[in-house]
């Protein structure tokens, strides 16, 4: 949509081998999940992946959704690892109008902005090719929340999708369902949250059900395929 020649889309620094391998594995996928533990540089991988999407004209822009308190951290990380200046969607309607109308390549916003700006986001996503990266994606683990439903509703409009978290499952295996549903709309873990929950609830016999455990593990293995 916009001339990429005006932007330096190179990464400032080469990643570690495992970061490069993760990037190679994910860059041609319509959706992917990175569940690396904290401290392994998921942010670097995500920024480099966004640059690759833009460089290859797969997307025009990348929206990165983070917890509200991490906006500044991500702005700094984008400056460190790329030559792109991120624009920020926030609670200011005028500011957001300017961002939506700009040729911004990286756009940051915190999760709650999606609820307030859902209608304009939907229009924006129909006007250009957009990739999305959800940082700390466990934020949308509750499938019947307004926040999770907002992202589920917008999901199909994104050209590329990536979720990042070091804790996709805290104490409950079914916490992962909503996050993966955002990516593939039920292809891997099914379209019914209640059915998935009943099959993976640790209060049932999953711990001693070999077939149930194997089915759960097999479902997770399909996420990036």
Where are these regions (language model features)?
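Conserved pre-motif I regulatory segment
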Residues: 2-35
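Walker A/P-loop
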Residues: 29-49
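Short hydrophobic/aromatic beta-strand immediately N-terminal to the Walker A/P-loop
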Residues: 33-37, 63, 162
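Conserved P-loop NTPase motor "coupling/switch" region that bridges the ATPase
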Residues: 59-61, 76, 80-83, 102-103, ...
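Conserved nucleic-acid-binding Ia/Ib motif block in the N-terminal RecA-like helicase ATPase lobe
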Residues: 65, 69-106
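Conserved helix/coil segment N-terminal to the catalytic DExD/H
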Residues: 93-128, 142
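Substrate-gripping "pore-loop 1 plus following alpha2 helix"
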Residues: 124-126, 139-152
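Walker B catalytic acidic pair
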Residues: 135-136
């Amino acid at each position: 949509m916009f001339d990429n020649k005006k932007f330096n889309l190179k990464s400032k620094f080469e990643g570690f081998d495992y970061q490069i391998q993760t990037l190679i594995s994910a860059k041609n996928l319509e959706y992917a999940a990175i569940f690396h533990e904290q401290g392994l540089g998921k942010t670097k991988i995500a920024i480099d992946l966004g640059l690759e999407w833009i460089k290859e004209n797969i997307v025009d822009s990348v929206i990165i959704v983070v917890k509200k308190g991490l906006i500044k951290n991500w702005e700094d990380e984008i400056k460190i690892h790329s030559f792109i200046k991120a624009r920020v969607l926030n609670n200011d309607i005028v500011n957001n109008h300017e961002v939506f109308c700009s040729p911004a390549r990286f756009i940051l916003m915190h999760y709650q902005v999606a609820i307030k700006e859902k209608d304009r986001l939907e229009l924006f996503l129909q006007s250009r090719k957009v990739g999305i990266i959800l940082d700390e994606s466990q934020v949308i683990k509750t499938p019947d929340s307004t926040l999770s439903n907002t992202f589920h509703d917008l999901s199909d409009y994104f050209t590329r999708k990536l979720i990042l978290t070091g804790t996709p499952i805290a104490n409950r295996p079914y916490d992962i369902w909503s996050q993966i549903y955002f990516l593939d709309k039920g292809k891997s873990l099914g379209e019914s949250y209640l059915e998935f929950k009943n099959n993976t609830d640790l209060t049932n016999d999953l711990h001693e059900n070999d077939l149930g455990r194997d089915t759960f593990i097999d479902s997770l293995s399909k996420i990036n395929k």
